[in-house]
């Protein structure tokens, strides 16, 4: 039986796409209120321009996901001058709507409760900045079930870097051979955890048909020790 389970957060314990969509819609609305002449298409181009530059400059760090940076850089490119107040306003609008849209995937809380009752330590290991990841956990109501939270901002490296797995194990006094990693990302979560000896579980609730799955993805999925499409399946694997 596992002594510790490490979970990814984004798109594992809650669905990411609807939250991101809600955040962008709110940021567009706020930009229009501030007097920017954006429609959906032009705002998408504006957002992607900022995102692209930030990822180019900060790739491999928690900052590469920071929406305030995306909006800051996008506004600089769009206006030719710093607009700190507007960048804050767009970032605030994005994250407020994002958090409001969040909801747990089915069986998430029940699974965490059962693991907790079995005496299994639960850690979150996640690629993003600490402030927003803590806000997400609060919003989802998961703080009572989690023994440890580690963000890539704390380590200065992102999954699949080994420190994102070895550090939580060290803090929980657990060995890799006794731990399980659960996540949706084949490279960051599965390959990274495999490299340090954890048992790996790919969480893929999409249930895409064989007709739409590429041979490359099917081959890559074999990197995971297990693949599940509901979190409720996890407790049988761990016990």
Curated annotation (Swiss-Prot):
It comes from the Archaea. Its cofactor is Mg(2+); Mn(2+); Co(2+); Ni(2+). It holds the Pfam family Hydrolase. The cation specificity is broad, with similar levels of activity detected in the presence of 1 mM Mg(2+), Mn(2+), Co(2+) and Ni(2+). Mg(2+) binds at residues 8, 10, 184. It catalyses: D-ribulose 1,5-bisphosphate + H2O = D-ribulose 1-phosphate + phosphate. Its EC number is 3.1.3.109. It is an enzyme of class 3 (hydrolase). One of its GO terms (molecular function) is metal ion binding. This is Ribulose-1,5-bisphosphate 5-phosphatase. It comes from Halopiger xanaduensis (strain DSM 18323 / JCM 14033 / SH-6).
